[in-house]
UniProtKB/Swiss-Prot annotation:
GO cellular component: cytoplasm
Organism from which the protein derives: Pseudoalteromonas atlantica (strain T6c / ATCC BAA-1087)
EC category: transferase
Protein name (database record): Ribosomal RNA large subunit methyltransferase K/L
Entry EC number(s): 2.1.1.173, 2.1.1.264
Length: 701
């Protein structure tokens, strides 16, 4: 008798234990999270390797012992007679799982086991087997738990979930053993006469695994490489008899399996995979929107089992929430009486379908914590719940804002403006319109607001927006804006490269809606930029902390004599150049990449007009010191005055809400102060008077 360990994903151990007991009724099994242990014969281990649809690995225990030091790992491994398991001409690899007080690195643990194996061969044969990470003949695994090491021979080789029919995948594929677990948990595995539908099939894994079940095809029947193939104690005759028996048990299925996806390319991949698995004829494939899928003809009951998109990224939720809501409505209309099982890592998406869950199971899909949620599409769940926006406070306020702004917009020459700015505290977002796109910025919720509640409110916003503003869900960009805490205000948030051209008062600007926290244009400074354009004719202009150069563009359009644009970021300096090119501006325009503070200290040129809109805080690696606008603004203005001609103006602005201008310190620089904050607030920012402060500081002649 031998001791074996069979592994699977966490959450599937009880299912795996049931499967093993069914395959080998005489076995007594013990479960641990993600593991099933049993004592038995090699034949039973072979049978599990061949037939288990839920296992990842089947491993034979070779040795174990308590570990107080790294040398104990070596000694425990050395107690195994490795020459009885594989020859010096074989290749091998060592995996190591777990850690202890003396082995806290898996590579180090694997190395100690490898050294013990190699040293044993060298001592006996003055030669050693080679290590190969690519298709090794023998795979050894060390597992450390609570200072106890167990050394195993992995009979599986590669993980058993790899059925070797999947040559290509779609996005976020579900692993084969997870697909089988879904089929079991859904109830279909024990009710295969009922039809099975996967309306978001991706690479087809769920449908293919179902077809393999229906035909009683052993999942590993086509596997060619095993961890025991070159094992010296392998019983080839026994193994061949198990293969022959498995081939004899294949049946012609009598069930309906339907798989579809909206993506034709993905459906083609699913067909190729089904063909490779030998079950193409047992699955009906179709290219169709999930919301348009209807039951197979003549079937009023059945199972829908699917792995829909999870929406791991915030930006994806804007498109997925309306999709799930519409899909839920479609399911209630067309699939009444059916059972629905969905795998997700985002339970909130399923809540938007407005159905009550019958059962939920936690499991791991790879490294992702997921839930398999079962719904019964019965009378209770098929009631169409109210989705009207007529009683939605957010939708009503948004409609009110749009109506109010519509009159103002007729006199404005822009297609980018704010339509909502946390008007209702419970809907704590800002919404900006850029042409046919919306950018939704979620402000960090107060600590006293539960995260689940804040998320629910955000989802209400996302669902309402396409209906109220008439913008497609896929053209809504989501961002999260937390309060600044000592870091630069410009942050990368994704890598989607959604570029857009907008216009404002005769100027054009290139924006990036997705790659940074800010888009490239500060909408609250729309009036400020107009004022700059009106004040700079025939003047030498300096724009510090210039960002993407929008103020510089307006200065050039205002016929400034020269415009110098300075920013610390190469990205933004290049962006500013592109904005100038977009407006066909050519002339004495200089673009400088530099730390504005250091550059200003060393610069001697004279200007008639200087625009300064620094960040509130910054600790960029490119800066020698930290920056705090409240603490440092007088020192900044002192250096700016050195570059200002008598009678010249500094337009100074910042967006620190509690900022207080040091009037005494500024006056001592010879500057006359004029607060123009109220004058620079656009209509769409009137309800947020502290969005920025703005002053014109004139140098006394």
């Amino acid at each position: 008798m031998f001791e074996f360990l069979v592994t699977t994903s966490k959450g599937l151990d009880e299912l795996l234990a049931q499967e093993i007991t069914k395959l080998c009724p005489q076995l007594s099994v013990k479960t641990k999270p993600g593991q099933v242990l049993f004592t038995g014969e090699i034949e039973q281990a072979y049978k599990i390797c061949l037939w288990s649809r839920l296992a990842n690995r089947v491993m034979l225990k070779l040795a174990d012992g308590h570990v107080d030091s790294a040398d104990d790992v070596y000694q425990i491994t050395s107690s195994v007679n490795w020459t009885s398991h594989f020859s010096v001409n074989s290749t091998f690899v060592v995996d190591f799982v777990g850690a202890s007080h003396c082995i806290n690195n898996s590579q180090f643990g694997a190395l100690k086991i490898k050294d013990a194996v190699v040293d044993q061969f060298n001592e006996l044969f003055e030669s050693r087997p080679s290590v190969s990470k690519i298709e090794p003949d023998i795979r050894i695994q060390g597992r450390m738990w609570s200072d106890k090491l167990t050394v195993y021979l992995d009979l599986s080789g590669s993980s058993l979930h790899q059925r070797h029919y999947r040559t290509k995948t779609g996005l976020a594929p579900v692993k084969e053993h997870i697909a089988c677990a879904m089929l079991v948990r859904s109830g279909w595995a024990n009710d295969q006469q009922a039809p099975l539908v996967d309306p978001m099939c991706g690479a087809g894994t769920i449908a293919i695994e179902a077809a393999l079940m229906a035909a009683n095809i052993a999942p590993a029947l086509k596997r060619e490489r095993w961890g025991f193939t070159r094992w010296l104690q392998h019983d080839a005759t026994l193994w061949q008899s198990l293969l022959d028996d498995a081939n004899a048990q294949i049946i012609t299925p009598n069930c309906v399996i339907s798989a579809s996806d909206i993506d034709h390319g993905v459906v083609s991949i699913a067909k190729e995979n089904a063909d490779a698995a030998g079950v193409f004829s047992g699955i009906k494939f179709n290219t169709i929107d999930a919301c348009k899928v209807i039951p197979p003809k003549g079937h009023t009951k059945g199972y829908i089992v699917s792995n829909p998109p999870y929406g791991e990224r915030l930006s994806e939720i804007t498109a997925l929430l309306p999709l799930f809501q519409a899909w839920g409505t479609s399911l209630k209309e067309h699939f009444k009486g059916w059972n629905l099982s969905l795998l997700t890592s985002n339970r909130d998406l399923l809540r938007s379908m407005k159905m009550f869950a019958h059962k939920e199971y936690k499991l791991m899909n790879g490294k992702l914590e997921c839930q398999l949620v079962n719904f019964a599409l019965d009378e209770k769940n098929c009631i169409t719940r109210e989705t009207s926006l007529s009683n939605n406070d957010f939708a009503n306020r948004l409609n009110k804002n749009i109506k109010r702004l519509s009159k103002w917009l007729k006199s404005e020459n822009t297609n980018c403006y704010r339509i909502y700015d946390a008007d209702l505290p419970e809907y704590n977002v800002a919404i900006d319109r850029y042409g046919d796109w919306l950018v939704v910025q979620e402000y960090a919720a107060p600590k006293n607001v539960p995260e689940a509640k804040a998320k629910r409110r955000l989802h209400e916003v996302i669902v309402a927006l396409p209906q109220v503003v008439d913008v497609p869900a896929e053209q809504i960009v989501m961002k999260v804006r937390a309060q600044q805490k000592g870091k630069s205000q410009y942050e990368k948030v994704s890598q989607k490269q959604k570029m857009l051209e907008v216009f404002e008062n005769g100027a054009k600007f290139k924006l990036n809606l997705t790659d940074y926290l800010d888009t490239g244009l500060f909408l609250d400074h729309r009036v400020t930029r107009q004022l700059v354009q009106q004040r700079v004719k025939d003047k030498d202009v300096l724009n510090l902390f210039a960002y993407t150069g929008s103020v510089s563009v307006h200065a050039a359009l205002g016929k400034a004599k020269s415009v110098t644009t300075v920013d610390m970021s190469n990205t933004y300096v290049d962006w500013a150049k592109e904005n100038f090119a977009l407006n066909k501006l050519k002339g004495p325009y200089e673009f400088i990449q530099a730390d504005c503070l250091t550059w200003l200290e060393r610069h001697n040129n004279q200007y008639d007009f200087i625009f300064i809109d620094p960040p509130s805080f910054s600790n960029s690696k490119r800066m020698d010191t930290t920056w705090d606008v409240q603490r440092d603004h007088v020192a900044l203005l002192r250096n700016a005055v050195k570059c200002l001609r008598p009678g010249g103006e500094i337009m100074f602005s910042n967006n620190l809400r509690q900022f207080k201008l040091d009037e005494e310190g500024v006056s001592q620089l010879g500057l006359t102060i004029q607060d123009i904050t109220q004058k620079t607030l656009p209509e769409d920012f009137k309800r947020n008077p502290k969005i920025h402060g703005c002053w014109v500081l004139t140098l006394n002649a």
